[in-house]
Amino acid sequence: MIEFRYFIPVFSLFVCLLTFFRFGTILNPICIVALWWSFWLFVANLSLTGLFIPGVHTQVLILTMIFSMLCGGILAKRRAGFHGKNILRNNLQLHKKWRYLYFILGFLIPVVSYYFVKAIRLFFSEGILGYRDAVFGDVDRPSVLFGSNYLELLYALLFSPIIHVSLLASIVFYLCFQDRRFLAVSVVLVIMDAVMRLGRFNFYYFVFFLFISYLFIRQRSRVRDPIGNGFRAAIKNVRVTIGALALCMVLILSVLSVMRSENSDNIANLLKRFAVEYHTVGFVLFDESLENPTSRLNQEISYGRSLLGGIDTIAVILLRRIDRNLQSISNENSPLMREFQVVGWDYDGYPILYNAFYTILYSMYLDGRELFFFAIPFLYGYFLSTRYQDWIGTGEIGTLMVLNMLTYTGIFSIFQSPVEGTIFWVTLLLLFLFNRIRILRRIQPVEAL
């Protein structure tokens, strides 16, 4: 695979140049997502930790996906904008409207606190590693934390998306309006949710949303208009706080990693696992399924159900009243993805075992084979680019939230497929519901308001 080691840097340079000429900066979401995937594919070719190097077919599919996304982003044009004074007023109204989420979070905090305290108690009775194995339920065994598959499902369908969208929105409103209370409540919920499931990605999400929101707001602040001037003044006051928050989240992430690890793991092994293997093992898992002619990936095709997995799950829940034998695509995929696979050999000659991290590549190939590696990334790049251009052109905070969510999808798809879960789709629904009234009101004449 030496050829890919040389080709990927050249390809990445091509992406940077093309997006720079299109958007005037390489720090645009198309380039960020493309370089993210290209960088980790390059690292995968180095096999730094003993993981197998992905095959030619897999690497060609990934590069095709990146190129198709690039084409969609380059060809996209921004929609017609609105007058600056209307946008400024709408941003203020949107901030007030999102404060209604406080009431919803007020109901969430007691429930999440209850399960948080229960999780702490179970840590001491079950042990950290024992709790980690039992916290997620399945069809045959309910979660030790929730005690019921229905309660766990309710939490996944309602509570997790609300926590997710509150994190996304509170960071934006903190950077734009210094709304510390909204951010504090969201951070507390994120920490409790992460600890009770021993999940580290919540903190990764926080650092990402903080960075990407600051980056995009800073870019919009360079536009010389009333909105840009307001953003420029706002972000000057939060730079130190941003650094402190990011550092705290990294420290908590490190502590949770130590808690979840085996006693024999040292800091170097933890860093190697989280910084390298977690970001590249998905290529190997997908490659092994792709090259196995008897795997489900090669024996079946799901015609779009996998990429609409969250919607599919909700639909199956409703339709089970008619046919109790119905299974969602995520339930069909889960048993196979939970099986550990040998993905390499460490320096001591022991096999490296991983599961779950199949990336969005698995969903796309299962849905539509090679065709979907052209079509889906093109559409994704197109919508990502239009949201970015809309944001730079208008400065609408609602557009920024959707832009952040789409960028998040492109970045974290390297681990698992966000669209196959319910959090992504319910979060989009919540964004739509909170922004819809504002959209309807802004088209009214100014004199009528």
Give a label for each model feature.
Residues 353-449:
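Hydrophobic alpha-helical segments
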Residues 8-12, 61-68, 160-170, 201-217, ...:
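Hydrophobic core segments of transmembrane alpha-helices in multi-pass, intramembrane catalytic enzymes
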Residues 30-39, 182-192, 244, 378-381, ...:
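Central hydrophobic cores of alpha-helical transmembrane segments
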Residues 5-13, 108-112, 155-169, 354, ...:
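Hydrophobic alpha-helical transmembrane segments
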Residues 81-239, 246-260, 445-449:
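Membrane-embedded catalytic interface detector for glycan/lipid assembly enzymes
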Residues 134-153, 247-380:
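Small-residue-enriched transmembrane helix-hairpin modules in multi-pass membrane proteins
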Residues 23-29, 171-184, 388-399:
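Membrane-interface helix-loop-helix junctions at transmembrane boundaries of multi-pass membrane enzymes
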Residues 11-118:
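A structural signal for hydrophobic alpha-helical transmembrane segments in multi-pass membrane proteins
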